[in-house]
């Protein structure tokens, strides 16, 4: 389970689509009682993101300069250590930096032990980088489709395989149609992100938590009495702007949409 308000599953196409360098969908899972602010332009900062009001950080964000970042937590129920720095500040640190994505990741690697386990993607218009402080050195990503949840990207859980299949076989073909209604596109995103299909027990990962909890967390969309998918996101970078739709999935604002368009600075 998340302790920092991080994303819990993300799929994106990087320089796969014409005139759309980045197309990303994701779910943020969190305890319902943990306070957070929805997607917004941060005051006196270049960041557009939601915000974890407990730690002050965020799970995913962009800037008008074309920088973007997203973090998922690396789940390890056996790790009982206390860490001095919140993973939620990684996004803000990158978005407010002028460093190239690979350089930022390489510098972060020097003090990565200060954080609980994470998967981190940082990028701009030309370069995307992945790293994990639990066994994946910073690597520049080739053009392609990437999916990660709460294990290493190289582990490829059945949960991530299922999302990759739906993202590549159902969603990307819609995007590649010459004429597609925005409503149809967005409906396809929510249908994929609200998938409650569970993985059968023998195919579950072992992350140091109970089998019952592994099963609960094995679906793209999670619901339980105290923890679950708090919001879903559909983010696109075109040649001249960001288009971001966030859907609140739990609580009093359930079903509420926030849609932002952020022009890119040349």
Predicted segments, located by residue:
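N-terminal nucleophile
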Residues: 2-266
């Amino acid at each position: 389970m998340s302790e920092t308000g991080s994303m819990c599953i993300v799929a994106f196409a990087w320089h796969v689509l014409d005139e759309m360098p980045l197309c990303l969908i994701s779910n943020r899972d969190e305890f319902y009682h943990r306070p957070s602010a929805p997607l917004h332009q941060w005051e006196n900062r270049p960041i557009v993101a939601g915000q974890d009001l407990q730690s002050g950080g965020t799970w995913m964000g962009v800037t008008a300069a074309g920088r973007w970042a997203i973090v998922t937590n690396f789940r390890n129920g056996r790790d009982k250590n206390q860490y001095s720095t919140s993973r939620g500040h990684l996004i803000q640190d990158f978005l407010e930096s002028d460093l190239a994505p690979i350089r930022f990741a390489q510098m972060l690697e020097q003090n990565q032990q200060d954080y609980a386990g994470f998967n981190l993607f940082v990028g701009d218009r030309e370069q995307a980088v992945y790293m994990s402080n639990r066994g994946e050195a910073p690597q520049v990503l080739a053009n392609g489709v990437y999916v990660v949840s709460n294990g290493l990207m190289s582990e490829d859980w059945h949960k991530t395989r299922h999302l990759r299949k739906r993202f590549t076989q159902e969603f990307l073909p819609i995007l590649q149609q010459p004429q597609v209604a925005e409503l149809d596109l967005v409906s396809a995103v929510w249908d994929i992100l609200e998938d409650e299909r569970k993985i059968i027990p023998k195919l579950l990962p072992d992350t140091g938590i109970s089998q019952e909890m592994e099963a609960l967390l094995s679906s793209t969309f999670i619901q339980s009495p105290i923890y679950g998918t708090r919001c879903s996101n559909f983010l696109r970078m075109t040649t001249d702007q960001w288009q971001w739709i966030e859907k609140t999935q739990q609580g009093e604002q359930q079903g509420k949409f926030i849609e932002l368009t952020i022009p890119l600075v040349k």
